């Protein structure tokens, strides 16, 4: 999805080596037709606090928990290349491969720093060029989320391609109602302790935040 919270397995399995898989290909992010810099998405996940050992127990630190996991750690990526000479369909798609590599090497690197390094190597060191390119890159993912997945809604997309609208698709497990539970009285899936209980899988205060409609960030609300 354009945005999801981190999985509660990170922070819930302290003695088990875990690998984080990022999707580099833009399956749910506009394919090669939309400029979406994924470095900010990757950083958002890696810097999410699991509170496994109190404040500061980020997903990044969970992945680097070498003492408990016998020195084993990994980050995987799922890319997709086409027949274009630049592989990715548009030039900025290459920035996502670059961002993945940099963060796999050092998961605490700033996505802004990575974007700047890539822009300098790709375009120019000219300040006016960098300013414009970085502005576009750093806002691109959030912009895509806002025009395709408002309020945390998901799967508003074509069934086959995961790109573009298809409200006429008739499938009992791929409809707005199935995913959004829209009725005349409400919208959204109740994942709180009074619903599916999914929020209980997170350490507090993360679980408490997701469990409270007044505290839950709007981007995760539905």
Model-derived segments and their meaning:
Residues 1-72:
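Active-site capping/gating regions of soluble enzymes
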Residues 54-222:
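Catalytic domains of carbohydrate-active enzymes that cleave complex glycans
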């Amino acid at each position: 999805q354009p945005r999801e919270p981190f999985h509660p397995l990170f922070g819930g399995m302290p003695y088990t080596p875990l690998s984080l898989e990022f999707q580099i290909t833009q399956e749910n992010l506009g394919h090669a037709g939309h400029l979406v810099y994924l470095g900010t998405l990757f950083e958002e996940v890696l810097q999410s606090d699991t509170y496994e050992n109190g404040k500061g127990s980020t997903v990044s630190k969970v992945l680097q928990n070498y003492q408990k996991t016998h020195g084993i750690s990994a980050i995987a990526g799922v890319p997709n290349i086409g027949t274009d000479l630049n592989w990715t369909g548009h030039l900025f798609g290459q920035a996502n491969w670059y961002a993945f590599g940099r963060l796999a090497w050092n998961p605490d690197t700033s996505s802004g720093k990575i974007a700047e390094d890539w822009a300098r190597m790709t375009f120019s060191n000219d300040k006016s060029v960098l300013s414009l390119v970085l502005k576009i890159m750093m806002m691109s993912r959030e912009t895509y989320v806002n025009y395709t997945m408002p309020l945390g809604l998901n799967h508003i997309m074509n069934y086959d391609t995961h790109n573009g609208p298809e409200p006429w698709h008739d499938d009992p497990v791929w409809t707005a109602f199935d995913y959004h539970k829209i009725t005349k009285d409400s919208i959204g899936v109740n994942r709180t302790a009074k619903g599916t209980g999914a929020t209980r899988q997170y350490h507090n205060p993360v679980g408490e935040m997701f469990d409270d409609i007044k505290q839950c960030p709007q981007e995760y609300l539905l």
